[in-house]
């Protein structure tokens, strides 16, 4: 008979240490609006032998992300935040921390504001990667970049990745980054940059582009 008991001398119910961190930061004009752009980071946290006192937790992530609220302005913006921790006692899956931050920028945000938001997030992601341990640099292939782009757009905007097609691409070898334009069957377009932070493929920016309606005037007289 197979035993399913837990062999643990200490406290049984625990969230465990964080093995993986997934962060999503988006910017939107108003609380009910679709985000104009979203940034995603997916990093592993190495070091199974790390001292429990030095273990990575959500408070560290929140402290690193806090400057994003003030990007481009002196006053902090309104935001919504969700946080999820996932842990299995049998260890078959990584203990994950999922964190989502949506910042309300206001309807009058300019191109300069958007750039300030971009810069603040890339700085925060870079700091997060320093805390978790910098990932090893590795070239990102075209196929891997397309897969990342599909998944990122699907995660950021809740679209079916199989309903998206690649309409344009640009490789930036010096930065180990790819800029890919994905289009859905419904006509929505997304510009996705894979490797937005120092060429790390797990850092992605997704920007939703305004849908352009094309009127067919042939035969209309």
What are the functions of these language-model segments?
Residues 31-35, 88-92, 169-176:
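Short, ordered beta-strand-loop transition motifs
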Residues 73-136:
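Membrane-inserting effector segments that mediate pore formation, membrane fusion
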Residues 120-178, 183, 187:
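Amphipathic, membrane-active segments
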Residues 56, 60, 112, 116-119, ...:
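Alpha-helix boundary/N-cap detector
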Residues 53-73, 102, 120-124, 128, ...:
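Ampiphathic alpha-helical segments that act as solvent-exposed interaction surfaces
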Residues 1-88:
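Membrane-active, amphipathic/fusogenic segments and juxtamembrane/transmembrane anchors
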Residues 163-221:
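C-terminal assembly and membrane-engagement modules of membrane-active proteins
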